[in-house]
Amino acid sequence: MQQGSAPKISFVSLGCPKALVDSERIITRLRAEGYELARKHDGADVVIVNTCGFLDSAKQESLSAIGSAMAENGKVIVTGCMGAEPEQIEQAYPGVLSITGPQQYESVLEAVHRASPPIHNPHLDLVPPQGIKLTPRHYAYLKISEGCNNRCTFCIIPKLRGDLVSRPAADVLREAERLVAAGVKELLVISQDTSAYGLDLKYAESSWKDRSVRARFLDLARELGELGAWVRLHYVYPYPHVDEVVGLMAEGRVLPYLDIPFQHASPNVLKAMRRPAAQDKTLDRIKSWRAACPDLALRSTFIVGFPGETDADFAYLLDWLDEAEIDRLGCFKYEPVAGATSNALPDQVPDEVKQERWNALMARQQKISARRLKRKVGTRQQIIIDEVGPTVAKGRSKADAPEIDGSVYVSSRRPLRVGEIVTARIERADEYDLHGTVAGF
């Protein structure tokens, strides 16, 4: 660093959207102190790596990122979920400057200060009111809580991030309002268990504008829906009170989209996972949700090859999917995670069987997705534009979250802008995407 110049930070953010929000908070604090962001590791005074430690494959990706930072720079600070159990990092890279777990923002800042002290300029404000975002300007993740009270056997998130800690409703709403004022058109509500929001606070009220708002899933969703942006709900568990939120979707207050991680359908597997096993009742609820809100899109994730999963269990899952008709689906092959209680379960499934089941499930889902998307041909859909080209733009409908769902490719005779919301006539559908033309031309 040259004498008098601002110190530069290079940042690597790995893992889920919750970790991305953690990265945004750290960067916002550092920018407020005058730090600049470097495009490359070798041009930075220090590198921060926000790790993921959920799966062994994610740990390997984190270790690889740390190794690259050490090779290209040498001054590396490690934080995030993998940092909660630092032994593996310390063994592989004993020269890292600091290792901390998730949400330990102050410890990260202290490590940065030790490695490269800030230059204070009281006349310069480097941070906009909405903070520093790592997403495109037109959408942002809004984290409403940390941690989780569930104890699924395959998951170590409670060990890494602790039990549920919800933010006061007014705090969430103030952040959301700042984001919308800064140009954000879509708020993606995230947590480990969004529908449990406020349980730890006993649904306490907090002051928002001229009224009090309870820290309750329904109340928060209703208030967010008044801010003038798309509101998309992720990581929702199918608790009974979710039915009330579907009512808000039917009224057009929040997007008709639910991201619910069902993980499986077989009662035997769900019991081994320690997840709600009444998936037959869930099918009835899905039908009632769609009756109340016909445009509802459902996204979910599933695990195949969980210990003890039999051919009959897997066949049950495929039949369940045919009836549920999940719109968007992600599937993972089970892999052991250090510290997870599922590691000790009997009847581990061979890797080749996991792969066969993954292939079969994704093939089945491809047909379901194509069938559901075909029904949208001839309709008009609102599309938020993510990328623009000379004649065709890439965007998403209300049924598509960024990065994980499908896309809508639209033609237009006029230039479109990133973040613009247009109405398009859908003319064609394939397995995962839609194609159309901006209406009015």
UniProtKB/Swiss-Prot annotation:
CDD domains in the record: Radical_SAM (cd01335)
Positions bound to [4Fe-4S] cluster 2: 148, 152, 155
Subcellular location: Cytoplasm
GO process annotations (BP): tRNA modification
EC number: 2.8.4.4
EC category: transferase
Family: Belongs to the methylthiotransferase family. RimO subfamily.
Protein name in the entry: Ribosomal protein uS12 methylthiotransferase RimO
Organism the protein comes from: Bradyrhizobium sp. (strain BTAi1 / ATCC BAA-1182)
